[in-house]
C-alpha cells in the first residue's frame, strides 16, 4: 500500500495495514488538519467547505469520512456529490465558501484516491500553505468541536448546471455557431464523472449527435484512465469507422482533455492548449500565454505569431496559475491537456476546453485534421532515471547545468531546462518518486528520442 503526502494534498491506495495507504485514519487526520488550517486562516468558528468527488469505487467511503471529520471540526459542508474537479473549484467561489476538498486521484488507477485541497478562491494551495497543513497533520495539532458546535451539511445538490451556464455565458463561446455546425461528436469519459458532465454540456451547446463510450460513472475504468494514445484505441477505432467530426477524451475528474480527429487519429494532448490558445489569441488580437517548462514549444510559436508574449512556469498547476496572474495571461495551462481560462476560473477545465474547441472548429470551417496541420509540429520523448537514496539530486542537476551552460538558454526555476535552436530538454526531480525525469522535444520523434537518450546517458555517467 502507498501513501504520498505533498503540498497539494494526500493520495494513496485504498486498503492495507493501519499505517499504510489512504485509509479512514489517515483521511480523517489530514481532513482535520485542513479544517484546522482553514479555521485559523478565516478566524471563523464555522467555516463553509465544499466537497465533491469523482466516481471512484472508494469515493463514497472517503466522502463519508471527509464530511464527518469536517462536521466534527465545526465546519459546515456543502456536498455537491459526483462532480468534476473544475465544477468543485467553481462551487467554492459560487457558494462563497472558505475552501474545498476534491476527492479524486485524477488519472491514477482505480485503487487510488486522494484529497485535493482548495482555498477560498477555488484554487490549489500554495507551497507554504500545503506545508503548514502537513505540519498540523503530523503534530496532530487540532481540536474537534464540542457537541454544541458540530457543523452541519447545508445542502447536497449538484453544481454542474451553474458550471455549464458559466461556460455558455463566455463571449468566446459561440453556441449558435456550434449548433449550426451540426457536429457529430464522440467521447470517452472512462467510467467517471465525465459521463455525467459531457452529455449535459453537449446538450447545452446544441450538439445533437453524440456517441458515448465508457459513459456509465461506475468507477470501474474500462482502460487506463490517463488519456494517452496507447489507452485510447477503442475511441480511435470507433471514430475511424464512422462519420464522427471530433472525439473528446477526459480523465476521471475532467481537468484534462485529449482530442481525436475525424480519421480516428490522436490530435496530440500537447496541442489541446495550443489550439484553444490560437483561437483566443486571434479573437483578442494577441495576448500573453503561460504553460509549464515541460510543455510543447508550439504554444510559444503560436503566441508569437499573434504578437503575444509567452512565459514558462515551473511544473504544477499552482505554479502555472501564479505565473498567469503575474503576466496577466489570456490563456494558459499544461501540456497534458489542461486548459486554464481565467475569464471562467483559474483551474484546468475540460468543459471550457471542449466549448472553446468546438467554437474554433465551427468558425474555421476546417476538419480537425486540417486544423492540426496549421500548427507547428513537434515530437516529444519522456525518459526517467532511478535516483539512489544516497545521491544529492540538487548537486547532480547543478553539475548538468554547469556543463551545458554554453550549449543553449538555461532555465533553472524547476530543475534544468536547456533551450536549443530547434529542440529542448527539461531535466527535473520528481516530486513524488525517487527518480529524475527527462523531457525532450524536437521536430521529429527520432530527434527527440536521440536527445533523451543523450541526456539519460549523461545522468547515468554521473551516477557511476
Where are each of the predicted segments found?
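Short glycine-centered, acidic/aromatic-flanked micro-motifs in structured strand/loop junctions
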Residues: 51-53, 187-189, 261, 343, ...
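Gly/Ser/Thr-enriched, mixed-charge loops and adjacent short helices
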Residues: 13, 113-242
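Proline/glycine-rich low-complexity loops and linkers
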Residues: 134-165, 169, 262-335, 339-340
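N-terminal small/polar loop signature for handling phosphorylated ligands or for N-terminal nucleophile
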Residues: 36, 48-112, 200-260
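Glycine-rich phosphate-binding loop of actin/hexokinase-like ATP-binding domains
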Residues: 101, 114-115, 119-133, 255-282, ...
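Phosphate-binding and adjacent anionic-ligand microenvironments
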Residues: 246, 284-464
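An N-terminal, well-structured beta->alpha segment
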Residues: 1-68, 72-73, 152-184
Amino acid at each position: 500500500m502507498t501513501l504520498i503526502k505533498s503540498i497539494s494534498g494526500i493520495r494513496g491506495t485504498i486498503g492495507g495495514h493501519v499505517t499504510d495507504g489512504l485509509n479512514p485514519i489517515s483521511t480523517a487526520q489530514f481532513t482535520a488538519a485542513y479544517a484546522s488550517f482553514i479555521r485559523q486562516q478565516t478566524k471563523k468558528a464555522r467555516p463553509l467547505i465544499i466537497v465533491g468527488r469523482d466516481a471512484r469505487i472508494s469515493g463514497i467511503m472517503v466522502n463519508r469520512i471527509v464530511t464527518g471529520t469536517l462536521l466534527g471540526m465545526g465546519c459546515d459542508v456543502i456536498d455537491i456529490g459526483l462532480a468534476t474537479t473544475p465544477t468543485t473549484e467553481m462551487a467554492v467561489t459560487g457558494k462563497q465558501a472558505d475552501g474545498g476538498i476534491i476527492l479524486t486521484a485524477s488519472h491514477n488507477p482505480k485503487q487510488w484516491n486522494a484529497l485535493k485541497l482548495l482555498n477560498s478562491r477555488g484554487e490549489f494551495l500554495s507551497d507554504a500553505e500545503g506545508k503548514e497543513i502537513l505540519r498540523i497533520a503530523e503534530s496532530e495539532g487540532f481540536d474537534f468541536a464540542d457537541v454544541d458546535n458540530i457543523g452541519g451539511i447545508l445542502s447536497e445538490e449538484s453544481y454542474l448546471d451553474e458550471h455549464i451556464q458559466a461556460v455558455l455565458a463566455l463571449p468566446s463561446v459561440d453556441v449558435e455557431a456550434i449548433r449550426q455546425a451540426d457536429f457529430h461528436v464522440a467521447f470517452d469519459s472512462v467510467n467517471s464523472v465525465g459521463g455525467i458532465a459531457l452529455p449535459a454540456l453537449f446538450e447545452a451547446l446544441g450538439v445533437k449527435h453524440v456517441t458515448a463510450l465508457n459513459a456509465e460513472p461506475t468507477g470501474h475504468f474500462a482502460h487506463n484512465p490517463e488519456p494517452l494514445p496507447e489507452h485510447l484505441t477503442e475511441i480511435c477505432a470507433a471514430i475511424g469507422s464512422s462519420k464522427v467530426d471530433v472525439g473528446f477524451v477526459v480523465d476521471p475528474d475532467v481537468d484534462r482533455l485529449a482530442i481525436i480527429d475525424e480519421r480516428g487519429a490522436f490530435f496530440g494532448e500537447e496541442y489541446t492548449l495550443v489550439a484553444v490558445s490560437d483561437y483566443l489569441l486571434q479573437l483578442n488580437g494577441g495576448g500573453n500565454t503561460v504553460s509549464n517548462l515541460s510543455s510543447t514549444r508550439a504554444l510559444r510559436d503560436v503566441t508569437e505569431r499573434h504578437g503575444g508574449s509567452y512565459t514558462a512556469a515551473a511544473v504544477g498547476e499552482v505554479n502555472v496559475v501564479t505565473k498567469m496572474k503575474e503576466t496577466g495571461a489570456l490563456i494558459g495551462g499544461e501540456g497534458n491537456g489542461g486548459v486554464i481560462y481565467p475569464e471562467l476560473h483559474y483551474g484546468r477545465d475540460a468543459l471550457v476546453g471542449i466549448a472553446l474547441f468546438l467554437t474554433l472548429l465551427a468558425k474555421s470551417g476546417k476538419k480537425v485534421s486540417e486544423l492540426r496541420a496549421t500548427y507547428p509540429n513537434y515530437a516529444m520523448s519522456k525518459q526517467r532515471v532511478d535516483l539512489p537514496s544516497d545521491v544529492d539530486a540538487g548537486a547532480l542537476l547543478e553539475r548538468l547545468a554547469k556543463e551545458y551552460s554554453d550549449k543553449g538558454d538555461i532555465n533553472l526555476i524547476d530543475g534544468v531546462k536547456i533551450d536549443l535552436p530547434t529542440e529542448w530538454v527539461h531535466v527535473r526531480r520528481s516530486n513524488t518518486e525517487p527518480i529524475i525525469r527527462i523531457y525532450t522535444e524536437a521536430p521529429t520523434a527520432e530527434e527527440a528520442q536521440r536527445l533523451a537518450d543523450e541526456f539519460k546517458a549523461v545522468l547515468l555517467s554521473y551516477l557511476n
